[in-house]
Curated annotation (Swiss-Prot):
GO terms for cellular component: mitochondrial inner membrane; mitochondrial membrane; mitochondrion. Keywords: Chaperone, Copper, Membrane, Metal-binding, Mitochondrion, Mitochondrion inner membrane, Transit peptide, Transmembrane, Transmembrane helix. It comes from Saccharomyces cerevisiae (strain ATCC 204508 / S288c) (Baker's yeast). This is Protein SCO2, mitochondrial. One of its GO terms (biological process) is mitochondrial cytochrome c oxidase assembly.
């Protein structure tokens, strides 16, 4: 009876303290009973995350941060370098192929113009330059030439076109180191003598050569290049009359053949790019004939 009373008293005491008997003897429990203080203390011994991990995943001993293998770092370094190199190579290849494609298209255009020009534009002519020397179609060979037809009494159009021609000559010479022969052929032989042309052209680029001739000579060369010619035949130098003519620049290759014409739709910059492209795409006649005999000649046709 006495033992039962003691058990009951102990249970009542523990129930009031809200502590299990097992908790008194288990250090990892939630609560620890302090008999001397009469209060409950919360334990700071928290369960570590590693205690819940499987044994095969627990870290044994001190944790060691091993350095990344040199081979791995090398391959990572090489990978991004190879990527950059591939991008640069792709960009360079695209730019090169684009430029080659443009040159090939320009070359085909020039070949088509030559085929047309050999029948319709150009041919033999005899004129006199502003130094009094003869000038024929043979003087067109060996260099690129630009022909322009005008007259010294032109009030506005011819000076504007000669200014544009001056710009092209200067840019090609200074930036591309390309020498081109600029020719100014007069459509007014009665008034444009060699001395008059020399004085008139002195206001423009010094490389421009003035050409003139007799009425029949000038009319003949205008006809060969399909230039509109309206100058009356029997006129006096002091007589006032109108001269009308076509407004084109004719680009001639070193073989003396027509390859392109530039009208007023070309400004200074676009005309310069057009001339530059034609010169860069130029292929000598011997090379064109050699290509035409190869099995891959269809590429250039």
């Amino acid at each position: 009876m006495l033992n039962s009373s003691r058990k009951y008293a102990c249970r009542s005491l523990f129930r009031q303290a809200n502590v299990s008997i097992k908790g008194l003897f288990y250090n990892g429990g939630a609560y620890r009973r302090g008999f001397s203080t009469g209060c409950c203390l919360r334990s700071d011994n928290k369960e570590s995350p590693s205690a819940r991990q499987p044994l095969d995943r627990l870290q044994l001993g001190d944790e060691i941060n091993e350095p990344e293998p040199i081979r791995t770092r090398f391959f990572q370094f090489s990978r991004w370098k190879a990527t950059i190199a591939l991008l640069l190579l792709s960009g360079g290849t695209y730019a090169y192929l684009s430029r080659k494609r443009r040159l090939l298209e320009t070359e085909k255009e020039a070949d088509a113009n030559r085929a047309y020009g050999s029948v319709a534009l150009g041919g033999p002519f005899n004129l006199t330059d502003f130094n009094g020397k003869p000038f024929t179609e043979e003087n067109l060979k060996g260099k690129f030439s630009i022909l322009y037809f005008g007259f010294s009494h032109c009030p506005d159009i011819c000076p504007e076109e000669l200014d544009r021609l001056t710009y092209w000559i200067s840019e090609l010479d200074d930036k591309d180191h390309i020498k081109i022969q600029p020719l100014f052929i007069s459509c007014d032989p009665a008034r444009d003598t060699p001395d008059v042309l020399k004085e008139y052209l002195s206001d423009f680029h010094p490389a421009i050569i003035g050409l003139t001739g007799t009425y029949d000579q000038v009319k003949s060369v205008c006809k060969k290049y399909k230039v509109y010619f309206s100058t009356p035949r029997d006129v006096k130098p002091n007589q006032d009359y109108l001269v009308d003519h076509s407004i084109f620049f004719y680009l001639i290759d070193p073989e003396g053949q027509f390859i392109d014409a530039l009208g007023r739709n070309y400004d200074e910059q676009s005309g310069l790019e057009k001339i530059r492209e034609q010169i860069q795409a130029y292929v000598p006649k011997e090379e064109r004939e050699r290509r035409s005999k190869k099995w891959y000649s269809f590429i250039f046709n």
